[in-house]
Amino acid sequence: MKNLLVRSIYKIKSTQWFRDRADEGDIYQHYMQMHKISLDSFKQHLQGDWEFVFFNKEVDDIQQVFQDHFFELYDLWKQGNNILYCGPDNLMIKPTKFFGEYNDFRMFNYTDPKSFNGIEHFLNADVRYYSADMNPDTWTEPLKQAENWDFSEWNTEQIILNKMLWNQEGRTPQNTIIPKMAYQAHGVWLTNDINQHIQRANAWNGCAIQDSHIIHLHGSRNAPNKLELMKVLHREFNENT
């Protein structure tokens, strides 16, 4: 059994995501720069013995990334590994344990919107943990759904993964949601009003940014600005400690 930190960055030909992102410049390079900062922060703080697995290729459409990576992660899990998936726009700012802490599939905090598509507690999928010991039946329905991927819906991946999470026996919001493990900074940008942004984000998350373990910057909401924000937060929380 290995402990794996996994992420992917694909070069995507189409600029159409949930909107046309052509105005953001070279998105691939922005994400690669975020990835380097992010990985440095995980090397600094992620506890335990672990290896890094990186998937990198070229595809036509963003939804291909999500579908491909669903099966890539499943293949790694079938080999008997514990897997922590964290996208490149995540910054770890405190010593943090994942490996061996959970025995099932986990996500940790809400996304925006907090309810969606009939899922009352709709969690963000950019920080997620697959225990090697999780029940294999957890995968049965999600694999069928992933084979019939809805390429027209931006949230297809999160819909599948939320159903996978909440269909597990004993999962409740009370024993699942831990905001500090995946602080959502979707509403924080590097502007003159950043302190106000953070205050609103703290209220939304239910915890203060400085008390979090991972900050998810949401690079899809303006990659150039989120990259600069990541640099600032990395200096503040990691390089000055």
Map each language-model feature to its residues:
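N-terminal anchoring/stem segment of glycosyltransferases
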Residues: 1-79, 222, 234-241
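Short catalytic/ligand-binding loop motif for oxyanion handling, primarily in non-cytosolic enzymes
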Residues: 13-16, 61-62, 92-95, 100, ...
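A structural signal for well-ordered alpha-helical scaffolds and beta->alpha junctions
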Residues: 32-39, 66, 121, 135, ...
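Structured N-terminal alpha/beta-domain signature
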Residues: 51-53, 83, 128, 160
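GT-A fold catalytic core of metal-dependent nucleotide-sugar glycosyltransferases
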Residues: 66-122, 128-137
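Catalytic core and acceptor-binding pocket of nucleotide-sugar-dependent glycosyltransferases
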Residues: 127-240
